[in-house]
Amino acid sequence: MGAALLVLGLGAARSPAATPKIGGCPVFPAFKGSATARSGANQSAWNQNVSEAPVDPRSGHYIARITSLGGNQVVHPDFGGNGVYGIPYTTVGPRQRRVRVKVTGYPDQSDFGRAPIPPGAPVEGGSDRHVLVLQRHRCDLFEMYAAHYVGGHGHRWNAGSTARFNLHSTRLRHDGWTSADAAGLSILAGLVRPGEVRRGHVRHAIRVTFEETRRAYIHPATHYASDLCDPDLPPMGLRLRLSHSYFHHNLHRFPAGSQSRVIFKALYHYGIINADNGGTGANWFITGARSTRWHDGDLNRLKTVPGTAFVVVDSRARVKTPC
C-alpha cells in the first residue's frame, strides 16, 4: 500500500484532527511516520476521518441485504433513558488492587486472570453484562463480557471473556481472537460519550450492531460471530458512513449546539464500525456510554436517519473468512 493510504488503506481518507482522550489517556493515537502507522489497518483506524474515503463497490449490496433483514431500519441511539440504557465504564487509579477474574467462556482468547476491577464496577444491563475499567496512570483498559461479581476472598469476578488494551498502542488482537465484543474490538473506543459531545466533536467511529452478520471480519476487527456465509451480509469491522448527499441535504434538521447534531456529523466524518450481533431487529443500533446527561428528545432526531442514507467505506483491506 502507498504511504498515502494511511491506516485503513483509504486513498482519500483524512488523518484524524485530534486523538480522542478518556481519563487523560489518548485512545489509540496514530504515530506519524512509525511502522505501526504505515503497516495497514490498526486500532488508530477508529480515529480516521472517512468522509472523503471511496465507497466500496459492493456498498449497494450490503445496504440492500441489511434492509432485507427487516426490524429496525433507522439509526437507533442505544443509550439515554435517564441513565438506563448504554454501556457504563469507570476509571481507577494506582491504588485499585488487582483481583482474580475467572474466565468461563473463552479463556484461550482472553488476556487477563487478574485485573484492577472494583467490586462496585458498573455492569451493563441485559444479557451481555459488559464491564469496562480504565486504569488511568497506565492507560490500560480492561473489558469483560458476561461479567458477574462473585466476591469472597480476593473479591473475584467471573467473565465469559476478557480483553486488555493499552490505549497508547495501536496493535490489533490476534487474528481469530474475540474480546469483550464479538468483533475483537475495544468497546470503549466506539462509545459515544456525553463529555465529547458537550465539547462539540466526536472524533472517532461509533460502534454499531446488526441483527445478522457474515462469518468474516475486516481489520481492525479480528473475530467473527456467525455461521452465515452470505457475501452481502456485513462482516465484523465493516465501516460505513453517511453519504455526501444525505449529510449535506439534512444537516440543517439538527439544531446548532444539539447532541444530535454532533452525533450526526460524526456519522458522516467518522462513520460506524460493525462490532457485534444485535438482538432480533436490532439493526443500526449505535452505542453510547450510560449517562443521565443524554437528552432523549434530542437524540430521537437521529431516528429519522434511514439505514439507506449510509454507504460502505472501501477499506481496501482483505475480508478474512473461512467461507
What are these regions (language model features)?
Residues 7-21:
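C-terminal region of N-terminal signal peptides and the immediate post-cleavage residues
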Residues 18-323:
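Short, surface-exposed polybasic-aromatic patches that bind anionic ligands, especially phosphate groups
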